[in-house]
Amino acid sequence: MNKTVVRCLLSRSHHPLIHFSTNLSLLHRVFTCSRYLTARFMSTPPPDDMFGFDDPFSPSDSREVVDLTKEYSFLHDSLVDYGNVNVHQVVPIITQSSIDARAIADAVSGVDDVFGRKSQKFLRQFREKLSESLVIEVLRLIARPSAVISFFVWAGRQIGYKHTAPVYNALVDLIVRDDDEKVPEEFLQQIRDDDKEVFGEFLNVLVRKHCRNGSFSIALEELGRLKDFRFRPSRSTYNCLIQAFLKADRLDSASLIHREMSLANLRMDGFTLRCFAYSLCKVGKWREALTLVETENFVPDTVFYTKLISGLCEASLFEEAMDFLNRMRATSCLPNVVTYSTLLCGCLNKKQLGRCKRVLNMMMMEGCYPSPKIFNSLVHAYCTSGDHSYAYKLLKKMVKCGHMPGYVVYNILIGSICGDKDSLNCDLLDLAEKAYSEMLAAGVVLNKINVSSFTRCLCSAGKYEKAFSVIREMIGQGFIPDTSTYSKVLNYLCNASKMELAFLLFEEMKRGGLVADVYTYTIMVDSFCKAGLIEQARKWFNEMREVGCTPNVVTYTALIHAYLKAKKVSYANELFETMLSEGCLPNIVTYSALIDGHCKAGQVEKACQIFERMCGSKDVPDVDMYFKQYDDNSERPNVVTYGALLDGFCKSHRVEEARKLLDAMSMEGCEPNQIVYDALIDGLCKVGKLDEAQEVKTEMSEHGFPATLYTYSSLIDRYFKVKRQDLASKVLSKMLENSCAPNVVIYTEMIDGLCKVGKTDEAYKLMQMMEEKGCQPNVVTYTAMIDGFGMIGKIETCLELLERMGSKGVAPNYVTYRVLIDHCCKNGALDVAHNLLEEMKQTHWPTHTAGYRKVIEGFNKEFIESLGLLDEIGQDDTAPFLSVYRLLIDNLIKAQRLEMALRLLEEVATFSATLVDYSSTYNSLIESLCLANKVETAFQLFSEMTKKGVIPEMQSFCSLIKGLFRNSKISEALLLLDFISHMVCPL
């Protein structure tokens, strides 16, 4: 580049110094400074910082060009000040040699005859100055090819100077511009006529150039011409030809050249011989390679054997490659780290992972350690093959070799384990966690893809707290998660119903300065809606609008659906209007959600009207608000839409209409899916139409849908309800025949059914069997079993089961305590019942129904109803404790344990301001106190009762009057009687 700039500067004048009339010493300082800048701009120093000792002609030099213009702007300014040099150009280096080269080039280029008297006279002054660099520079400055040849010939004639290989190469490069271009005959003739020796060397150089360029045909033609002129190819030419053919995998051609070379009594150099031996081994001819060594009288060294081993690995001759290690040792030529690494990489490239283990152990025993890059490749290979255990061991081997595992290898291992959803198991996840802990200790982070995969695996294994902490730990190590990473982790937590952790992570995300997008907000809104936490979902909905994040149709649909399921139809309609006003049009999912939501809100007729309008009916005015933006070209009902309405019919026991809708689906070309069939079968079972349910099951099978656990569960549950255990057993046998193992729901239904018909021992055996088969009972199973033993009076067994629940990690819920306390009361174990109530309070159960609805999830409606809890659960703001207290107080009154009953009633008053539902309890307790001659206590309770808003029954007044008479308090009795008469018949 410097020479090009020099040429531009000097082409303006015949004399190179015409533009530099200022102080020469100052100019020299400027150019010295610019020389440093030029070196800095053109390349970066080599790794050892020994600038100037790197080979500028090395083909492997791939150093980056670093732009330091800004950093050294002050030096550019100084150049402008002193020399008026353009700061955007690299300042050339002017030397005496450059001046001479320009002078010679101008002289030669300006004349037709270089060998004329005038030219010879001018050039004579430069004879003693001729050198390799000067000649090359002149050749590059001369424009005309003929003049280039003339100067080349003239320079070769001068005493004290002889052309070198770089000069020949420069000449060939100037004459042959294209790789496939031949040298013009006139140029060859000119060189030949002048100096045959130079001509012969020139032809050799020409052959080598075409070999390096891969132009084999031209190289062979030039070789033929060289021979035609009775010149011998040089050793370098033969070596270059052989190397070129070997590089092109033309082993036969290389062999022919070698045979000719041998006939000329020439030997290959060491590099060419190694390449030849490698190529022979690569095609399995390793014996020929050894013969070649003997023929060439070459003494093999470590580099040579390493090359042979590399070729044998390419040929998949691994046993032979291993044998060459022994050959090396036999010749006192020890394998080094390059040898072992070559063998190791060769086995690795051919997927010979078993041999890799053997080679790795051998080389480490001999103190030869693979590089971190090779370790990374090994870990990747073993992870790909599924041997994650050995991949983890390689991390330990890295440490033994002095290499600390870093970012790449940890991400390879953890990413491979967590990236394969199908093969993941507990052992592999434990291994990933172990590697993750070590990675944290080393201060290394996962990339965002592997953070998402790792947290997904942790969530799937139920390790939600660990998944939640991963983000925080990664941030602590310098990892900066983006919105996408947070969204994926939030989605995993929400899908696992870990709403509290999702809430905390979402808030942490916002505190970190990240702005949630519509996708993230929609995940949170949809998940919290499905969990019944509508108020929080609405807060986020409002928040996203405030921060300028426009909700999409999915966001609106999730919230509308939640409002409808919560029977807040007005809120849903208002939100639907907002959606339309914001220009967000409902889609088929929205309308399907409307139908499902209205069904769950008990408005099946409204759902039918929406469905009719979707089908094209215009005479349905009551649902106009939902169809302001709906036209005939909009999407028709799909299988989800049909399924939502069909499920609504079944849940409201309108199974005939559900059956007709199923037929209508098929007529409209909408094929029912598994979910639709299962919903209809469950609906038919619920109303006792078991024969029709079996018919639908048969139809389902004919359409290619095998019975599922849900199908079998519906049938088994109903058969037990109608006390047809024989048919339930047949369904169970059919399940097992179809390799459909019962789950905890089916086992629980069977256990509950057996308990209901008094077969408690059989139910208990079934529960033991399900544990043996690896299906662990849940809280519903234990509660059903406790209820069964309670019905036959085995309270001790019930308590043992409660204790067993704790040891198994199954927490009892409200229904469990309610069932057990009820049976304790019925069997007279009032103290035990009271202790259970205290235990229930101490475990921090919620005080209102809204907080414990999720607690009873999993129990079917019939079971809850059989315990008398259905009405309690349906009333908002009713404390779940109150029913348990009432149950226990009533039984204490019957047992005449009035003091404890009074104390519990006082406790009840702390939970609720109004005790209207306790009217009968108050009246019973007043009557019992009067019968026990505790009239004063009865009057105090009467006073508290009226203050709480509980209206006394006439029986309470009668009990109080009788009690007063028995205690000879006649006047008080008459006053109370007078009060009653005025209350009943006011004046």
UniProtKB/Swiss-Prot annotation:
The keyword Transit peptide applies. PPR repeats lie at residues 164-198, 199-233, 234-268, 269-299, 301-335, 336-370, 371-405, 406-446, 447-481, 482-516, 517-551, 552-586, 587-621, 638-672, 673-707, 708-742, 743-777, 778-812, 813-847, 881-915, 918-952, 953-987. Residues 1-42 form a transit peptide. It comes from the Eukaryota. Keywords: Mitochondrion, Repeat, Transit peptide. Disulfide bonds: none annotated. It is found in: Mitochondrion. One of its GO terms (cellular component) is mitochondrion. Belongs to the PPR family. P subfamily. PANTHER family: PENTATRICOPEPTIDE REPEAT-CONTAINING PROTEIN 4, MITOCHONDRIAL-RELATED, RESPIRATORY COMPLEX I CHAPERONE (CIA84), PUTATIVE (AFU_ORTHOLOGUE AFUA_2G06020)-RELATED. This is Pentatricopeptide repeat-containing protein At1g06710, mitochondrial. It comes from Arabidopsis thaliana.
